[in-house]
Amino acid sequence: MVKWSKTELTIINDIFSHLDYDDIGPKALSRCLIVYPWTQRHFSGFGNLYNAEAIIGNANVAAHGIKVLHGLDRGLKNMDNIVDAYAELSTLHSEKLHVDPDNFKLLSDCITIVLAAKLGKAFTAETQAAFQKFMAVVVSALGKQYH
């Protein structure tokens, strides 16, 4: 079980209370698909992913980015038991979708980068530490079924 300080919980809750899901989600998933093109294989049904412009303008990518970002709400609501909160999604991604668990870390990094760009100076080292700790726990939970 992960131990969260009051400061970490405050920072994480503050980030999510101001998060623009419709902006951050599409940008983060688009970045992941552009920077790590091999991740596109899981999105073959999304239509044109031929280049960066097509990915950024793809409505399916945008919608899934929003869905993924809202998926983090599950962890936020279950900070004391994130692993169990993501057990079903871990099984889905490992057994049905066959997603390489390393892709969770790649997307996590992209979410962090987009969030940092959005928050600017407000994305302090302390904010980054708390957010990346949260994301690392979520990534670990999503990869749990693979172990």
UniProtKB/Swiss-Prot annotation:
**Is Transport set as a keyword in this record?**
yes
Report the source organism: Cygnodraco mawsoni (Antarctic dragonfish)
**Which residues does the UniProt record annotate as the domain Globin?**
3-147
Per UniProt, the keywords (alphabetical) are: Heme, Iron, Metal-binding, Oxygen transport, Transport
UniProt-recorded name of the protein: Hemoglobin subunit beta-1
What does the annotation say about its assembly with partners? Hb1 is a heterotetramer of two alpha chains and two beta-1 chains.
Q: Give one GO term, molecular function aspect.
A: peroxidase activity
Pfam families associated with the record: Globin
What lineage does UniProt assign to this protein's organism? Eukaryota, Metazoa, Chordata, Craniata, Vertebrata
Remarks, miscellaneous: This fish has two hemoglobins: Hb1 (major) and Hb2 (about 5% of the total). They display the Bohr and root effects.
Record: residues binding heme b: 64, 93
Function field: Involved in oxygen transport from gills to the various peripheral tissues.
Determine if Metal-binding is one of this entry's keywords: yes
The record's tissue-specificity note reads: Red blood cells.
Q: Which family does it belong to?
A: Belongs to the globin family.
List, in alphabetical order, the GO biological process terms annotated in this UniProt record: hydrogen peroxide catabolic process
Q: Cellular component GO terms, alphabetically? A: blood microparticle; haptoglobin-hemoglobin complex; hemoglobin complex
Top-level taxon in the UniProt lineage: Eukaryota
